[in-house]
Amino acid sequence: MELSHIIVLALVQGISEFLPISSSAHLVLVPKLLGWADQGLAFDVAVHVGTLAAILFYFKDRLAGLVRDFFASIARREKVGDSTLVWSVGFATVPVGLFGLAFNDAIEQYARSGLVIAAMTIIFGIALYFADKKSGLKTEYEMTIKLALIVGLAQAIALIPGVSRSGVTMTAALMLGFSHSASANFSFLLSIPVIVLAGGLEAVKLLKTPDALPWSDLAIGAAVSGLSAYLCVRLFMALIARASMLPFVIYRMILGVFLFVMFL
């Protein structure tokens, strides 16, 4: 890959991974607009490593506390600190894992068209608009197992390209009365096991290919996606604490219409 391609695609992945705007829509749009070939599986793994590193670094202090509370709760067989939040993230991850195993092949075959991505971008942009009006004051620490499973079921829908994993999980949390910040925080924490699972599956496929890997290209892609993702999360959290989701809704509408025009 050319250096310019690496930087642009890694930036697109890093910026769109955690915003409620659908990274898959952008990764379809940009190469088509610019006439670039598919970036390949190795690059996908690299940028996932970058975005995972970004969110781990952003939450490093909180994650240390959550892990400590989680293992303490197991040892004592009772709730310790914020251990319930860890269980909530775990239970919310189950649906996407099960749905992925059951329907991934069908989704790959039938749902990766430009028109499907365009439709999902618009439909779930509208859902985000209405969910935004339902936001409440609940914090992520009030996430029960039942509510986490509801968010997890919503996340499973994001296996369909164009839905946006972060967008649909924030939408579900907002509909359940969580605040903007809490919805985003839970969505981002939930991204950690999902990125690990998705990246792990891609890595397994990659190990089965005999091709030599362009390590320097992959390192650049991981670094650019990681840095851009980290900065994007920081800016988004600062913005969402005092603003609505409307800018992202409008952006999704425009993007969806543009995708329809391109693929019709």
What are the roles of these predicted feature ranges?
Residues M1-L264:
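Multi-pass membrane proteins that catalyze or facilitate reactions on polyprenyl-/lipid-phosphate substrates
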